[in-house]
Amino acid sequence: MKKLLLLLGLVALSECLYKVPLVKKKSLRQNLIENGLLKDFLAKHNVNPASKYFPTEAATELADQPLVNYMDMEYFGTIGIGTPPQEFTVIFDTGSSNLWVPSVYCSSPACSNHNRFNPQKSSTFQSTSQTLSIAYGTGSMTGVLGYDTVQVAGIADTNQIFGLSQTEPGSFLYYSPFDGILGLAYPNIASSGATPVFDNMWNQGLVSQDLFSVYLSSNDQSGSVVIFGGIDSSYYTGNLNWVPLSSEGYWQITVDSITMNGQAIACSGSCQAIVDTGTSLLSGPNNAIANIQKSIGASQNANGQMVVSCSSIQSLPDIVFTINGIQYPLPASAYILQNQQDCTSGFQGMDIPTPSGELWILGDVFIRQYFAVFDRGNNRVGLAPVA
């Protein structure tokens, strides 16, 4: 009888999936547009997605998270920090590795408009003397590091290091729909040697598998989810195709080719790509993206966005990413984003340091089409068409 109970317990653990619901909200860009601030923002800040992966600040600082690159994010989840837990809305970001939230020590307008962590109201908080700096645009966010219990989908992640911001210059953050960032990349790109949240979960035996997975819903305000410690096959069709990482740090893989109408439009002879839930669009080298924008008839509007005629979506071709020998087509309905105002291209150019070659960022535009599994135990990414 005892053996049976033990077996049942092990089965229950193996099937336990910890799910964080993600809510779709207006992006920071949309909020800036509605408040008439986008033009001023773009004049003051160079929005270059590559700065997230090639920071110019010292490696010891938390400079791998320039905040301007989150301005198009729409998917957010809730976590709790402290005892009792204080609630925060965060971006679950596979393109960075640190956790940070605003603190009560920050009195700038951007902080006062968001949830702020109060260490004095947590019985489990431990302070440190370590500082952090988060670079973005023309200024930086500064703060300190501390330890506390982080609640994620019912998991109590104890003794978790995280950042508490003390200054947040820049009025644009006032309009951001999120409080902070929860990074899900590898520990070797974390600032100050901090252990990322998922690594801490695994090290403490809080999840049964050394992986997590992401489903992003295309249409609904709800339905999107991050799953810790397992895979839910109801979110995808067919089989998962596994892609080995070409580099461990970011979730970086090799793309064989990118084609349209059977012709190569970029990435001839293979290229590198990062699968990043913390990037909303699909980013690539400026020249390649310019060719794609021209091919789909996109032109720039007053808000700096590339727009196409909504009536042309049905006639636009698929753009096909071939990865590890498998084709992943993106239909126009995926790479053209329809909102109340217009139809915008889901592609974005970026400046990349020359030694890095051709790099692409497979953001939410791609992940909405393909359920993604981030397998730390085997250093690979699994992809399958969403159900």
UniProtKB/Swiss-Prot annotation:
Record PTM Phosphoserine, positions in chain: S129
| Subcellular localization | Secreted
EC assignment: 3.4.23.1
Residue numbers covered by the propeptide annotation in the UniProt entry:
17-61
Write out the entry's keywords from A to Z: Aspartyl protease, Digestion, Disulfide bond, Hydrolase, Phosphoprotein, Protease, Secreted, Signal, Zymogen
Matching Pfam families, A to Z?
A: A1_Propeptide, Asp
From the record, give the cysteines joined by S-S bonds. Answer: C106-C111, C267-C271, C310-C343
Instruction: Name the catalytic site residues.
Output: D93, D276
Instruction: Indicate the secretion signal residues.
Output: 1-16
What is one GO cellular-component annotation here? extracellular region
Describe the location of the Peptidase A1 domain by residue ranges. Answer: 75-384
Asked if the Swiss-Prot or TrEMBL record annotates the protein with the keyword Disulfide bond, the reply is yes
Q: Which reaction does it catalyse?
A: Preferential cleavage: hydrophobic, preferably aromatic, residues in P1 and P1' positions. Cleaves 1-Phe-|-Val-2, 4-Gln-|-His-5, 13-Glu-|-Ala-14, 14-Ala-|-Leu-15, 15-Leu-|-Tyr-16, 16-Tyr-|-Leu-17, 23-Gly-|-Phe-24, 24-Phe-|-Phe-25 and 25-Phe-|-Tyr-26 bonds in the B chain of insulin
Which GO molecular function annotation, any one, does this entry have?
A: aspartic-type endopeptidase activity
The superkingdom of the source organism is: Eukaryota
One Gene Ontology biological process: proteolysis
Please give the family membership noted in the entry: Belongs to the peptidase A1 family.
Any idea what job this protein has? Shows particularly broad specificity; although bonds involving phenylalanine and leucine are preferred, many others are also cleaved to some extent.
Protein name in the entry? Pepsin A
